[in-house]
Amino acid sequence: MSKIRGNRKTRVGVVISDKMDKTVVVKVDQMVKHPIYKKYIKRRVTFKAHDEENRCNVGDKVSVVETRPLSRDKRWRVREILEKNVIL
């Protein structure tokens, strides 16, 4: 019997800080359509994500997945590193 977890959100972003132990800050860019003017606007969101083995460095493109609360600010965890050292 395998436990199926609910739909977990996944995002792709770039690591902008790795100065904390087992934690990275990931910047995620989204294009959102303005409801009135119908113009696409770039929105940036930053997440603190758990990096258990401290493998991520600044500039890495990573995939993060939603998880249970790990601390006051951490609700995401690094799933995999997609590219190393992407230029910001």
Curated annotation (Swiss-Prot):
Provenance organism: Syntrophotalea carbinolica (strain DSM 2380 / NBRC 103641 / GraBd1) (Pelobacter carbinolicus)
Keyword Nucleotide-binding included in the entry's annotation: no
InterPro entries: NA-bd_OB-fold, Ribosomal_uS17, Ribosomal_uS17_bact/chlr, Ribosomal_uS17_CS
Role summary: One of the primary rRNA binding proteins, it binds specifically to the 5'-end of 16S ribosomal RNA.
Protein name as it appears in the record: Small ribosomal subunit protein uS17
GO function terms (MF aspect): rRNA binding; structural constituent of ribosome
Subunit structure, as described in the record: Part of the 30S ribosomal subunit.
Keywords of this entry: Ribonucleoprotein, Ribosomal protein, RNA-binding, rRNA-binding
Family per similarity comment: Belongs to the universal ribosomal protein uS17 family.
GO biological process entries: translation
CDD domains: Ribosomal_uS17
GO CC annotations on file: cytosolic small ribosomal subunit
